[in-house]
Amino acid sequence: MSEKPAFVSVQQSLRKSFDAIEPLHEEWNNTLLECNPHLTSLSNLAEQLQACQRVLFKKTPLSSFINLQEHLRFKLQAAMEFNLEILNQKLSTLQRIRDSVSQVVGSVLYMYETSIEKIGLEAILERSSLCPSIADMLEWLQDIEKHYRNQYLQRKLLLQVCGGHLSDIQALPQSWAKQRDAASSKQQHVEDILLSVSFFRMST
């Protein structure tokens, strides 16, 4: 392995970047899990609100309760807004993670671009059983950044689309799960990358 100062500096930057990304990756996964109960609650409340709007209370024994239908509708809408607010807070967390990953990757790429002439192509492509090549790791970092960027956008769009349509809100848990399943291979790719650089990160 090359021991040029520029080469070592880029390796150190790569090591720090993966060290920074691993806890962000864990926080991302935990945040998505924390969304699930609120997605389910929001869906159930939307179903109840839709039923409340369809029923003619005047033709039921409940007609003796003045403004009951309006009161129930208000309570359900307030509960939906509460859950939607929490989901938007979770979305803000995902945005922060996405931005943090982009900043980490951007910093490494900048160091690489300013050092490439000093390192040389041969050293950039050099790898060992314990240390992936700089080229490989840079590509992996860009894959990770792209994954978070795309996933954040998809989650944001799902919450925006369901804004005023009860049927879309009811289907939100299923839509969210479909998005998760569609991205499962990319998610696994991130896991594999972190595993592939585990020995490299422990080396000095």
UniProtKB/Swiss-Prot annotation:
It comes from Xenopus tropicalis. It comes from the Eukaryota. The gene is airim. Part of the 55LCC heterohexameric ATPase complex. Does not associate with pre-60S ribosomal particles. It is found in: Nucleus; Cytoplasm. One of its GO terms (biological process) is ribosomal large subunit biogenesis. Part of the 55LCC heterohexameric ATPase complex which is chromatin-associated and promotes replisome proteostasis to maintain replication fork progression and genome stability. Required for replication fork progression, sister chromatid cohesion, and chromosome stability. The ATPase activity is specifically enhanced by replication fork DNA and is coupled to cysteine protease-dependent cleavage of replisome substrates in response to replication fork damage. One of its GO terms (cellular component) is cytoplasm. This is AFG2-interacting ribosome maturation factor. Its main location: nucleus.
